UniProtKB/Swiss-Prot annotation:
It comes from Rattus norvegicus (Rat). Its EC number is 3.1.3.-, 2.1.1.-. This is Damage-control phosphatase ARMT1. It catalyses: beta-D-fructose 1-phosphate + H2O = D-fructose + phosphate; beta-D-fructose 6-phosphate = dihydroxyacetone + D-glyceraldehyde 3-phosphate; L-glutamyl-[protein] + S-adenosyl-L-methionine = [protein]-L-glutamate 5-O-methyl ester + S-adenosyl-L-homocysteine. Mn(2+) binds at residues 251-252, 289. Its cofactor is Mn(2+); Ni(2+). The keyword Oxidoreductase does not apply. GO terms for biological process: DNA damage response; methylation.
Length: 439
């Protein structure tokens, strides 16, 4: 097999990876420090002087981290005692082993971008963990919750649309298929709401996304949703016993999570699936990623909404969780720096879990980077090849483009895009559905 290309890294001055490490990550760290400052009185109320001291300690550790990053210091081992600490430090050793003699140590602007960016979020977690009694404070909670509240109109419109379709089994197959594609596209464009891309600034969904779908269609660069529909339709007819499990590896909380839950509800209600398994992060991650607290918080706030459609959806979703038709999982692997092709070795239990699915949907850009190994693949390399052997089950990536990595395009397609829109890879304006079917 041909050798895999080099990793994306901030060594390439002017690249998106370089600008992320140079500008966006320090901006995110500054915002985290500011968040801690603003909660000082809350920490004092809850924990007295000890809470204030903890806040000072966390800020001091985060300021040190920001300085290390901005001055391109060597990457240092983690010192906390978490379930993943040893795996992280082994991975740092592995990165060190890849360097040539004159390269020195792994560094922020030199080592693979995926590694150093994940490492930064893991160090944020370490700083909080080392500062009891505020060690369970989610520094990103505020911005995630804000995104949900600012997107109320869009969420309500989406829930109203879903409820108007019910009972979905009464619809004809063609209408179910049309709605399947529509709700998939809504889940795709929900992925635009990414707080790590906006440096933690507001990125809520205020427009009515349902009525925008027609205008957004030309921005889907690869659309393999027909293959996904064909697979689910076939599974529905042939599954023995009649059980179809769909797994969704989540990305952002807030509006995007609601679009994923609406799609999951549709899959159950249309009997295209009998159970949905969601996969989230065990720690706050990449500003807006879903943790179990976010998942439960969204369902609870939907149910408690004064808006009827939202409240009805929230109640239905709570019931799905209660009946185990919706199951939430988290696993330390999702917040490691490893590409997904390493999952069978690093997290065989998680790989075995995904193998139980009829299909696995991977939401968002970070999951795409990990699926592709965050390498400088040519634009025309087939999606299956770039997965480097990762195939626990048929899978589909649903992602808006937010980094300089894209495979599976037609010859000339990337060049045409570059000519018309030089930043097409990084703005979240374009999207893809890429499918890797049954082997």
């Amino acid at each position: 097999m041909a050798e895999s290309p080099a990793f994306l890294s901030a060594q390439d001055v002017g690249s998106f990876a370089y600008l992320t490490i140079k500008d966006r990550t320090p901006q995110i760290l500054t915002k985290v420090i500011d968040t801690l400052h603003r909660h000082k009185s809350e920490f004092f109320e809850k924990h007295g002087e000890e809470g204030v001291e903890a806040e000072k300690k966390a800020i001091s550790l985060l300021s040190k981290l920001r300085n290390e990053l901005q001055t391109d210091k060597p990457i240092i081992p983690l010192v906390d005692k978490c379930v993943d600490t040893d795996i992280w430090n082994q991975y740092l050793e592995y990165q060190r082993s890849l360097l040539n003699e004159g390269d020195g140590e792994p560094r922020w602007f030199f080592s693979p971008w995926l590694f150093v960016e994940c490492y930064m979020y893991r160090r944020i977690h370490e700083a909080i963990m080392q500062s009891p009694p505020i060690h369970d404070f989610d520094v990103f909670k505020e911005s995630k919750d804000e995104n949900f509240f600012e997107s109320q109109d869009s969420i309500n419109a989406l829930c109203t649309h879903l409820l108007q379709l019910k009972p979905i089994t009464d619809l004809g197959e063609k209408q179910i298929q049309d709605e399947f594609f529509k709700l998939l596209q809504i889940s795709l464009w929900g992925n635009k709401c990414d707080l790590s891309l906006s440096g933690g600034e507001s990125s809520s969904q205020k427009a009515d996304i349902i009525n925008s779908l027609k205008d957004l269609k030309p921005f889907i660069l690869v659309n393999e949703t027909e293959s996904l529909w064909a697979l689910l339709s076939k599974l529905k007819k042939t599954a023995e016993p009649p059980a179809v499990r769909v797994d969704i590896v989540l990305d952002n909380s807030g509006f995007e999570l609601v679009t994923d839950l609406v799609f999951a509800d549709f899959l159950l209600s249309s009997e295209l699936a009998t159970e949905i398994h969601f996969h989230g992060k065990i720690i706050p991650w990449f500003v807006s990623d879903v943790t179990v607290r976010d998942f439960e918080w969204i369902v609870e706030h939907m149910k408690g909404s004064h808006l009827e459609s939202m409240s009805a959806c929230g109640a239905a979703w709570e019931a799905y969780v209660g009946m185990k038709k919706w199951v939430y999982h988290d696993h330390a692997f999702w917040t490691l720096p490893h590409p997904f092709c390493a999952m069978p070795q690093v997290a065989p239990d998680l790989y075995a879990e995904l193998q139980k699915a009829g299909v696995v949907l991977f939401k968002g850009d970070l999951n795409y980077r990990k699926l592709m190994g965050d390498r400088k693949w040519k634009f025309t390399v087939p999606f299956h090849q770039a997965l480097s052997g990762f195939h626990p089950a048929p899978l589909c990536s649903i992602r808006t483009l937010k980094c300089e990595l894209q495979v599976g395009l037609q010859p000339g397609q990337a060049e045409h895009l570059t000519a018309s829109d030089p930043h097409w890879l990084t703005t979240g304006k374009y999207g893809i559905f890429q499918f890797d079917g049954p082997l």
